[in-house]
Amino acid sequence: MLIWQEEAWHTTENKIDIVTGDIKEASHIFGNDSYEVIVSNPPYMIGEHGLKNDNEALYIARHEALCTLDDLLRESAKVLKMKGRFYMVHRPFRLPEIFTKMCNYGIEPKRMRLVHPYADKEPNMVLIEGLKGGKPRLAVDPPLIVYTKDGEYTEEVLKLYGMK
């Protein structure tokens, strides 16, 4: 979520705690069954797949160097309360693996939406919602198109960003 208005930012001041730690230890840091919602933008690339950035921080953010999909889902399943929601943005090429692992950890995929940079391009992102302890049933939302053919944000993206 992007916060565009300063007053919106100030209303969240006392509601956010920033904790620094290893995500592989999340259940030890926060305890089991402690959160109703988890939102994640994890590293997308496995090993050396994709372009390697010389900037170590960017490399770690984009590649599963310190945190794998298994690490994220295992700890999320522990930390989420029953019927808690799990949200993630990832790459479509990993969907079969993502759905398999979510189910293996008891987080049922409930909704997905493919994100296309342009209407005539393949999707490059996928938005996923899961439910801990949910029953099998996946809803597929209409695709989200980010840019018009002229390179401007689409009306929907402008609305999502609070710019319309």
Segment roles from a protein language model:
Residues 36-37, 42-71:
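Mobile active-site "lid"/loop adjacent to the S-adenosyl-L-methionine
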Residues 122-164:
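SAM/dcSAM-binding transferase cores
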Residues 3-36:
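S-adenosyl-L-methionine
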Residues 27, 48, 96:
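Glycine/Thr-rich phosphate-binding loops of Rossmann-like dinucleotide-binding domains
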Residues 32, 50-53, 99-102:
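Short amphipathic alpha-helical segments
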Residues 65-117, 121-123, 127:
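Conserved Class I SAM-dependent methyltransferase catalytic core
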Residues 25, 44, 132:
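Short, glycine/acidic-enriched loop or turn micro-motifs at the edges of active sites
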